[in-house]
Structure formats: structure tokens, C-alpha cells
From Swiss-Prot:
Keywords: Coiled coil, DNA-binding, Transcription, Transcription regulation. This is Transcription elongation factor GreA. It comes from the Bacteria. PROSITE patterns: GREAB_1, GREAB_2. GO terms for molecular function: DNA binding; RNA polymerase binding. It comes from Streptococcus mutans serotype c (strain ATCC 700610 / UA159). Residues 2-30 form a coiled coil. Belongs to the GreA/GreB family. PANTHER family: TRANSCRIPTION ELONGATION FACTOR GREA (PTHR30437:SF4). GO terms for biological process: DNA-templated transcription elongation; regulation of DNA-templated transcription elongation. Necessary for efficient RNA polymerase transcription elongation past template-encoded arresting sites. The arresting sites in DNA have the property of trapping a certain fraction of elongating RNA polymerases that pass through, resulting in locked ternary complexes. Cleavage of the nascent transcript by cleavage factors such as GreA or GreB allows the resumption of elongation from the new 3'terminus. GreA releases sequences of 2 to 3 nucleotides. InterPro entries: GreA/GreB_C_sf (IPR036953), TF_GreA/GreB_CS (IPR018151), Tscrpt_elong_fac_GreA (IPR006359), Tscrpt_elong_fac_GreA/B (IPR028624), Tscrpt_elong_fac_GreA/B_C (IPR001437), Tscrpt_elong_fac_GreA/B_fam (IPR023459), Tscrpt_elong_fac_GreA/B_N (IPR022691), Tscrpt_elong_fac_GreA/B_N_sf (IPR036805).
Length: 160
């Protein structure tokens, strides 16, 4: 059985490595200390501080495991390997809805780097899936929960 790969830019991988370091060197020791303090309160069966600290420990360990997996199976995507005007991971694309002047800007990132509020959409999202591989000037049909609409790719550039 082959493992899932996680396409991402080198910058995304470096960000994950920083998050992992923060979790291992700061958050994990903080949680361990909270558990130690909560244990000192005595009876663990009715110790809400202990339960909360154990829940946080499970959350932190889950994050560590998830990030380690993403780093281990990272597939670094070189956006320079595709045409300058082609949409790919590591590129920012400006699209205009056909029939309007409404423009949107998206940076295509691996799933680990997605942040919709910052305009970073996962390569696995329906919008990115429709755009990846297309070029400046192409018209693309986007399927969304709100309905289908057509966009024209106005500009593609490397994400900074």
C-alpha cells in the first residue's frame, strides 16, 4: 500500500517544520508541566484541571503526529517547473467572473498551507482543481455549493 503524498511548496514544508518545533519544544513541555501540577492536587477522578491537561496533551500529540506525517510524505512542488502563465501549486492566480468585473485572487497551496482568509486555497479544493493546469486567458467552469460559474484567468504569477 502506497502512502499518501502531500504536495506543497518548500516554504510550506519549512513552515510545518517550524510549527513542529514549536509544538515539541514549547507546547508539549507546557502541557506536561500542567499535568504534573494537576496531579499534585490529589484525587484524579474528580480533577478537572488534570482532565483538561490530558485532553490538551492528546490534542498536541495529535498535531505533532499529523505534521510529522505531512513532512515525511511531503512532495515538494517546484512552481518554476511549469510555464509562467500556468496555474499550479505555488502560483497566485487572478480570475474574473465571466459577465461581471468581479475579480478574485487565489494562491494555490498544498492542503497543509490552506488559509481561506488569507486567500490561500488548497490544491484539493474544487476551485483549485478546476484551475490547476490552465493558463492565462483560459475560461474555466467552477462548480461550487452555491452553483456553477465561469471565470477567465486574468493573470498567473509565482507566489511570493
Amino acid at each position: 500500500m502506497s502512502e499518501k503524498t502531500y504536495p506543497m511548496t518548500l516554504a510550506e514544508k519549512e513552515q510545518l517544520e517550524q510549527e513542529l518545533e514549536e509544538l515539541k519544544l514549547v507546547r508539549r513541555p507546557e502541557v506536561i508541566e500542567r499535568i504534573k501540577i494537576a496531579r499534585s492536587y490529589g484525587d484524579l477522578s474528580e480533577n478537572s484541571e488534570y482532565e483538561a491537561a490530558k485532553d490538551e496533551q492528546a490534542f498536541v500529540e495529535g498535531q505533532i503526529s499529523s505534521i510529522e506525517t505531512k513532512i515525511r510524505y511531503a512532495e515538494i512542488v517546484d512552481s518554476d517547473a511549469v510555464a509562467k502563465n500556468e496555474v499550479a501549486i505555488g502560483k497566485t492566480v487572478i480570475v474574473r467572473e465571466v459577465g461581471t468585473n468581479d475579480e478574485d485572487t487565489y494562491s494555490i497551496v498544498g492542503a497543509a498551507g490552506a488559509d481561506v482568509f488569507a486567500g490561500k486555497i488548497s490544491n484539493e479544493s474544487p476551485i483549485a482543481q478546476a484551475l490547476i493546469g490552465k493558463k492565462t486567458g483560459d475560461k474555466v467552469m467552477i462548480e461550487s455549493p452555491a452553483g456553477s460559474y465561469q471565470v477567465e484567468i486574468v493573470k498567473v504569477k509565482k507566489t511570493k
